[in-house]
């Protein structure tokens, strides 16, 4: 399936630009104070990361290195902390708009559009994460695991606004797929272009804010995009195999 690489590339560039870290911080800001907050934040972070990554391995590595130590610190046994992260990351493969490679193969073999696949996958994906939330809550009650202290939780408003630009390419992708009914390849191609523009503009503005040369910011943004392209190529190897 020729357009799989474009979706892998989109997720890799967005993650390299800081999208993965943004979703983790946003998850902790949203549910970190709840009972068993670290486990629930890990589930939500993996679900949000699943929006941009169809790889359960990449999802686990991206979120797990941060969430598992916090879950263990809160009192959750190491085995259960690992189980929560793996279960949430594996479910990320069925979270639209970017799903696992099997979704693309399914669309081609059945002769249906990728749009049809993701619309039918959305509700089961949401239900699966609700179930994980419920199970983690029961475990937290049983083990008497509290939420994180206020001092360790990032402020919600500030956190959301700090990375709202990461949501723009995802919105464009969903809009082109679901509303305009573009082909998957065309939708993700223009989403990648919009993401690259956002990265370059962000770095130029950041450089000007620090009274540095805009060309330095532009160069940094280009290097960031190149790093994302390299990561996308590496991630595609696992899909191809």
What is the predicted role of each segment?
Residues 47-48, 90, 105-109, 171-175, ...:
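Alpha-helical transmembrane segments of multipass membrane proteins
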């Amino acid at each position: 399936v020729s357009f799989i690489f474009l979706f892998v590339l989109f997720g890799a560039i967005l993650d390299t630009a800081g999208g993965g870290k943004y979703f983790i911080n946003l998850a902790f800001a949203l549910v970190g104070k709840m009972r068993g907050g670290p486990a629930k934040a890990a589930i939500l972070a993996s679900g949000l990361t699943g929006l941009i990554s169809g790889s359960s391995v990449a999802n686990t590595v991206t979120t797990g290195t941060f969430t598992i130590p916090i879950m263990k610190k809160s009192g959750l046994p190491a085995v259960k902390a690992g189980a929560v992260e793996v279960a949430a990351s594996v479910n990320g493969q069925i979270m639209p708009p970017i799903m696992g490679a099997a979704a693309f193969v399914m669309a081609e073999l059945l002769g249906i559009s990728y749009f049809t696949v993701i619309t039918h996958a959305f509700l089961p994906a949401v239900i699966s994460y609700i179930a994980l939330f419920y199970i983690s809550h029961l475990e937290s009650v049983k083990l008497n695991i509290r939420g994180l202290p206020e001092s360790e939780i990032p402020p919600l408003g500030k956190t959301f606004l700090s990375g709202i630009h990461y949501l723009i390419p995802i919105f464009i992708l969903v809009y082109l797929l679901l509303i305009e009914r573009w082909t998957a390849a065309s939708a993700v191609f223009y989403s990648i272009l919009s993401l690259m523009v956002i990265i370059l503009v962000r770095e130029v503005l950041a450089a000007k804010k620090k009274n540095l040369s805009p060309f330095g910011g532009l160069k940094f943004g280009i290097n960031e995009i190149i790093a994302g392209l390299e990561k996308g190529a590496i991630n595609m190897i696992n899909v191809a195999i």
